[in-house]
UniProtKB/Swiss-Prot annotation:
Entry similarity comment: Belongs to the RuBisCO large chain family. Type I subfamily.
Name of the protein in its database record: Ribulose bisphosphate carboxylase large chain
Catalytic activity: 2 (2R)-3-phosphoglycerate + 2 H(+) = D-ribulose 1,5-bisphosphate + CO2 + H2O; D-ribulose 1,5-bisphosphate + O2 = 2-phosphoglycolate + (2R)-3-phosphoglycerate + 2 H(+)
Domain of life: Eukaryota
Free-text comment on the cofactor: Binds 1 Mg(2+) ion per subunit.
Quaternary structure (record): Heterohexadecamer of 8 large chains and 8 small chains; disulfide-linked. The disulfide link is formed within the large subunit homodimers.
Annotated binding of Mg(2+), by residue: 201, 203-204
Organismal lineage: Eukaryota, Viridiplantae, Streptophyta, Embryophyta, Tracheophyta
Top enzyme category: lyase
C-alpha cells in the first residue's frame, strides 16, 4: 500500500508547496478598466526573488494558498485570481520594490469597503515571506465606484446648506477634551461660535463618559448653536460625536441630533469601523445631516514608511464609505505631513478626476465619476500665524480647525475665535487682491491685528 502522504497522478494535481510566481506573476497581463489596481511597497526576506514576492502578495490577497488544493479544479482561477503584473525598484532602497497587483472586480462585494479591505489587506500583511508590506495606493474602477453612495451631501450641498461661499470654513475643537461638564462645554461652544467660527467640535474620544453623558452634551451644544445663530445671523454647527459601542447606539444618537435640528454629527471612522460608518452616512443622507469624520487611530496604520497603508488609501475608502469632512493633516502644524503628498490625497478627496502623479504619491489615475467630494480638515497645532500658509495650501474648499489656537487666546475663547475669523478674512481678501500669501503673510496678519483682539 502506498503511503498516505503520496498523491497519485490520476488525482489531477500535485500536492506540496508551490512557487507563487508560476501562477500569479503575469507580466504580460493587460489591466482591464474593471480591475481594482493596487501598488504595494514590498520589503521581503533575503533570498526571495522579486517575482516570487510580488506573486505571493497577489496570491495571498486573492485566491491563493500555500499549496495546490483539489477544489482549484472546481472554479476558474484565471477569472478570479489576483495578478502581479509589474514590478519596479524603489530608488535608494535595495530590499524594496513596488509590486502592482490587479484584482478582478468579481472578488468584491458591491458597496462594501469592509469587504474590499478584508480581501486586499486582511491576511497578506502577516505573511512570513515578507519582512514588511505597505499598500501605497488603489485604483478604484468606475464600475465599483458606482456601487457606493459616498459622502452624504458633498462640498457644494454643504455650502448651500450653510450659505457660506468663497472662503475656507473655520472650526475649533473644544478643550480640554475630557473632564468638562456638559453645561461648561456648551458655554465654550457658544463663545467660539459667537466669536465668528462656523463650527466647533467634539474631540474624538468624547463619547458618553461619566463626567458628561452624550444626551446632556447634545442638549447644551444645541442651545449654544441656536443662541449664536440668533445673535450672528449665520448658520452654525457643532460636530456632535455619535460614535458609540454599537451601531444601534450610534444611530440612536444621530436620531436625537436630527430631532434637535442641528446640522452636523461626527464619527470616528477607523475605530468605529467602515460598516458602522457607511450605515451612519446612509442615515445622514436620508435625514439631512452633514457628517464630519475623524481619523483617530490612522497613525497606527499609516505612520510607518514601509508597513501598513498610506493615508491616501484610507482617504479614498472614506470617500466611498461616506463622510462630508475628514481630517487630512496640516503640513504646517504639529503632526506629520509632506506638502506635495498631502495635497495629493487632498485632491483625491475633493476632485472628480485626478491624474497619476508620482511626485505627489498618486500611483494611478482615479475617476470618481461625480461621487460627491469631501472637505479636507486641517487641524492640530495651528494658530493665526499659520493662516496665510493654510489659506494658500488648502484653498477655499477646506475646514481650518483651531483648538488651542482659539481657546488658548489670552483674552478668552470668544476673542480667540474673533482673531481666527479676522485673520482668515484678511488672508482671503489679500489673496483675492493678488497679494502673495507666502511672501506677505506676516504683514497681512499684522495689519489685521488692529481689527482683532
Amino acid at each position: 500500500m502506498s503511503p498516505q502522504t503520496e498523491t497519485k497522478a490520476s488525482v489531477g494535481f500535485k500536492a506540496g508547496v508551490k512557487e507563487y510566481k508560476l501562477t500569479y506573476y503575469t507580466p504580460e497581463y493587460e489591466t482591464k478598466d474593471t480591475d481594482i489596481l493596487a501598488a504595494f511597497r514590498v520589503t521581503a526576506q533575503p533570498g526571495v526573488p522579486p517575482e516570487e514576492r510580488g506573486a505571493a502578495v497577489a496570491a495571498e490577497s486573492s485566491t491563493g494558498t500555500w499549496t495546490t488544493v483539489w477544489t482549484d479544479g472546481l472554479t476558474s482561477l484565471d477569472r478570479y485570481k489576483g495578478r502581479c503584473y509589474h514590478i519596479e525598484p524603489v530608488p535608494g532602497e535595495e530590499e524594496q520594490f513596488i509590486a502592482y497587483v490587479a484584482y478582478p472586480l468579481d472578488l468584491f462585494e458591491e458597496g462594501s469597503v469592509t469587504n474590499m479591505f478584508t480581501s486586499i489587506v486582511g491576511n497578506v500583511f502577516g505573511f512570513k515571506a515578507l519582512r514588511a508590506l505597505r499598500l501605497e495606493d488603489l485604483r478604484i474602477p468606475v464600475a465599483y465606484v458606482k456601487t457606493f453612495q459616498g459622502p452624504p451631501h458633498g462640498i457644494q450641498v454643504e455650502r448651500d446648506k450653510l450659505n457660506k461661499y468663497g472662503r475656507p470654513l473655520l472650526g475649533c475643537t473644544i478643550k480640554p477634551k475630557l473632564g468638562l461638564s456638559a453645561k461648561n462645554y456648551g458655554r465654550a461652544v457658544y463663545e467660539c461660535l459667537r466669536g465668528g467660527l462656523d463650527f466647533t467640535k467634539d474631540d474624538e474620544n468624547v463619547n458618553s463618559q461619566p463626567f458628561m453623558r452624550w444626551r446632556d452634551r447634545f442638549l447644551f451644544c444645541a442651545e449654544a448653536i441656536y443662541k449664536s445663530q440668533a445673535e450672528t445671523g449665520e448658520i452654525k454647527g457643532h460636530y456632535l460625536n455619535a460614535t458609540a459601542g454599537t451601531c444601534e447606539e450610534m444611530i440612536k444618537r444621530a436620531v436625537f441630533a436630527r430631532e434637535l435640528a442641528v446640522p452636523i454629527v461626527m464619527h470616528d471612522y477607523i475605530t468605529g469601523g467602515f460598516t458602522a460608518n457607511t450605515s451612519l452616512a446612509h442615515y445622514c443622507r436620508d435625514n439631512g445631516l452633514l457628517l464630519h469624520i475623524h481619523r483617530a487611530m490612522h497613525a497606527v496604520i499609516d505612520r510607518q514608511k514601509n508597513h501598513g497603508m498610506h493615508f491616501r488609501v484610507l482617504a479614498k475608502a472614506l470617500r466611498m464609505s461616506g463622510g462630508d469632512h475628514i481630517h487630512a493633516g496640516t503640513v504646517v502644524g504639529k503632526l506629520e505631513g509632506e506638502r506635495d503628498i498631502t495635497l495629493g490625497f487632498v485632491d483625491l478627496l475633493r476632485d472628480d478626476y485626478i491624474e497619476k502623479d508620482r511626485s505627489r504619491g498618486i500611483y494611478f489615475t482615479q475617476d470618481w465619476v461625480s461621487l460627491p467630494g469631501v472637505l479636507p480638515v486641517a487641524s492640530r497645532g495651528i494658530h493665526v500665524w499659520h493662516m496665510p500658509a493654510l489659506t494658500e495650501i488648502f484653498g477655499d474648499d477646506s475646514v481650518l480647525q483651531f483648538g488651542g489656537g482659539t481657546l488658548g487666546h489670552p483674552w478668552g475663547n470668544a476673542p480667540g475665535a474673533v482673531a481666527n475669523r479676522v485673520a482668515l478674512e484678511a488672508c482671503v481678501k489679500a489673496r483675492n487682491e493678488g497679494r502673495d500669501l507666502a511672501v506677505d503673510g506676516g504683514d497681512i496678519i499684522r495689519e489685521a491685528c488692529k481689527w482683532s483682539p
